[in-house]
């Protein structure tokens, strides 16, 4: 490939990316208030996820299954984890938009102490949502690699350890999920228990 052709490819990629982000900005959701949060959240089975990421569950699985049966069971578990991580990442995006709107909102008729506490809660949610989305993106990439290369019976690689998905570098699922849930609760409390409960129920899996 000549230098001229390479330059054209780079320019095409840059223009495509610019158009993608431009259209994304035009089609983004308007200022997301707390009333716009519950209806857009997707239920997630966090309890089952935590069980799958538990090292004790991993040990039991390896002791009870071997070979093809183990790899097939791991593929099922990885697809389950991927589905719920996608939902969690979506939810974190919704919560991030909410926190952005709250940080821009002007607080009228309240003390300076209350206003600062309110903004601090919004900042905590903003930070927690960003961290969780980063963890989810890295974990989803890791799951894709495992599904392709580590769970195929014809590829001579050791089966993966699902508990390793509990952390990506310094990002730990249990800590990040707890931080995100706590931040949602803290900010939601400023709107009263009814609004707070509505958001948290939408965030949890249906019983």
Q: Positions of the model-derived regions?
A:
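N-terminal signal-anchor transmembrane alpha helix of single-pass membrane proteins
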Residues: 1-38
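Cytosol-/stroma-facing membrane-proximal "stalk/adaptor" domains immediately downstream
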Residues: 100-207
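Phenylalanine-focused residue identity feature
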Residues: 6, 21-23, 29, 40, ...
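Membrane-proximal, non-transmembrane interface segments of integral membrane proteins
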Residues: 31-103, 107
């Amino acid at each position: 490939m000549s230098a001229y052709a390479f330059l054209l490819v780079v320019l095409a990629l840059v223009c495509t990316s610019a158009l993608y982000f431009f259209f994304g900005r035009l089609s983004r959701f308007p200022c997301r208030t707390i009333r716009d949060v519950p209806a857009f959240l997707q239920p997630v089975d966090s309890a089952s996820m935590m069980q799958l990421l538990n090292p004790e569950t991993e040990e039991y699985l390896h002791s009870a299954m071997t070979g093809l049966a183990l790899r097939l069971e791991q593929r099922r578990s990885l697809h389950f984890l991927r589905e719920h991580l996608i939902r969690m990442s979506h939810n974190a995006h919704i919560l991030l938009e909410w926190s952005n709107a709250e940080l821009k909102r002007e607080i009228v008729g309240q003390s300076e102490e209350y206003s600062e506490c309110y903004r601090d809660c919004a900042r905590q949610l903003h930070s927690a949502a960003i961290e969780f989305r980063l963890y989810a993106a890295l974990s989803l990439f890791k799951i894709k690699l495992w599904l392709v290369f580590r769970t195929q019976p014809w590829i001579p690689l050791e089966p993966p350890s699902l508990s390793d998905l509990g952390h990506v570098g310094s990002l730990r699922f249990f800590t990040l999920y707890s931080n995100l849930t706590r931040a949602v609760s803290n900010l939601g409390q400023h709107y009263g228990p009814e609004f707070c409960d509505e958001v948290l129920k939408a965030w949890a899996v249906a019983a």
